[in-house]
Curated annotation (Swiss-Prot):
Species name: Borreliella afzelii (strain PKo)
GO cellular component: cytosol
Subunit structure: Monomer.
Matches recorded under Pfam families: PGK (PF00162)
Primary subcellular site in the record, as a coarse category: cytoplasm
Name of the protein in its database record: Phosphoglycerate kinase
The protein's Enzyme Commission number: 2.7.2.3
Length: 393
């Protein structure tokens, strides 16, 4: 089902539009180290500005645990927005209360203001009705554009929609469109590349994508549990012993469905898990008992390249090795390059794989790079996200 968007709303002129954004950006000593999420909100903000809206932005930042903590103030975001929008974005000292509401009522068409961190109130994460009502008093219309928080049923993502007409922004629409396309109607051949360290955090995604995929590539730390389940030795590599049967049953299911599963055929290993460890190549499925698997080898990459070249749809979620250590990032870098050069629909879903694509400067060559970490993962698991459900037509 598609969602209602800003384009479905008649007129924003003169209206206070409460826009839930995801400005949960990384801060280093009070300054923003990556403004990707702020830039992702700009198309919606610009669209509303052009239509004479009075824009009241709302977001969370970090985990202040329901208390006012200026370390988590959105002030740096207001400063960055002022530069990006080329206009003064006023920072309000709170997100609810009569003084704040009065200030929003004094706004002029085209004004943009930012409310203080909603998570300074414990009621936000509890989706407290009274808090949601107070928050809704800052707007006449609600626009939800925080896909990164859409898997949370909080007051600012779900609760306010009980009190205001609600539509999705362009980012929410884009995420729903591309992730939805991958799940509902992927053009074949469809290749799912799933990495990351733990089977426990990715098995639901693997199972959700299995019946739709032609090929599933499994890499990262979780691949060793799959290899172990097939009887290979994995040395000191990461093993989730309680997921050996789960891995085994997944591989059996894939075989029954005729889905090809690519596991590491060779490895880059090390003596210990350390960024300064010396990489060593093992041209075998088996890893020596005193070694740790850290990355995929050249034969595995050749196998992945064959399927990526002919793919019409690719979803990639999670790194293929310990990419945060430069010596063990080559497998992930090569896969990022392969995905970027694929002519089909390519979607990179959330978290570390997005960081990898950015690290190797390839994001502009990917059809869609998702901004949601946990939200992308839950969407790909086939779960209904509460922040999207409230926007459905």
């Amino acid at each position: 089902m598609s969602i209602k968007t800003v384009k479905d709303f008649n007129s924003f002129a003169g209206k206070r539009v409460l826009v839930r954004c995801d400005f949960n950006v990384p801060l280093k000593e009070g300054s923003i180290s990556d403004d990707t999420r702020i830039k992702a909100a700009l198309p919606t903000i610009e669209y509303l500005k052009e239509r004479g809206a009075r824009i009241v932005l709302v977001s969370h930042l970090g985990r202040p645990e329901g208390k006012k903590n200026l370390k988590y103030s959105l002030k740096p975001v207001a400063n960055r927005l002022s530069g990006l929008l080329n206009q003064d974005v006023k920072m309000f000292s709170d997100c609810i209360g009569s003084e704040i509401v009065n200030n929003t009522l004094q706004m002029k068409d085209g004004d943009v203001v930012l409310l203080e961190n909603v998570r300074f109130y414990a009621e936000e994460e509890k989706n407290d009705k009274n808090f949601a009502k107070k928050l809704s008093e800052n707007g006449d219309v609600f626009v939800s554009d925080a896909f990164g928080a859409a898997h949370r049923a909080h007051a600012s993502t779900v609760g306010v929609s009980d009190y205001l007409p609600s539509v999705g922004g362009f980012l929410m629409e884009k995420e729903d469109k591309f992730l939805g396309e991958v799940l509902k109607n992927p053009e074949k051949p469809f290749v799912s590349i799933i990495g990351g360290s733990k089977v426990s955090s990715k098995i639901a995604v693997l199972e959700s994508l299995l019946s739709k995929s032609n090929v599933v590539v499994i890499g990262g730390g979780m691949a060793y549990t799959f290899l172990y389940s097939k009887g290979y030795s994995i040395g000191k590599s990461l093993l989730e012993s309680e997921y050996i049967d789960t891995a085994s049953s997944f591989l059996r299911k894939a075989k029954e469905l005729g889905v090809k599963v690519i596991l590491p055929l060779d490895h880059i290993v090390a003596d210990d898990f350390n960024k300064n460890s010396t990489p060593e190549y093992i041209d075998s499925l088996n890893i020596p008992e005193n070694k740790i698997g850290m990355d995929i080898g050249v034969n595995t990459l050749k196998e992945i390249e064959k399927v990526v070249k002919t793919a019409k749809t690719i979803i990639w979620n999670g790194p293929l090795g310990v990419f945060e250590f430069d010596s063990f990032s080559k497998g992930t870098a090569k896969v990022a390059e392969m995905v970027a050069s694929c002519s089909g629909l390519t979607v990179v879903g959330g978290g570390d794989s997005v960081a990898a694509v950015n690290k190797f400067n390839l994001s502009d060559k990917i059809t869609h790079v998702s901004t949601g970490g946990g939200a992308s993962l839950e969407y790909l698991e086939g779960k209904i996200l509460p922040g999207i459900k409230v926007l459905e037509k």
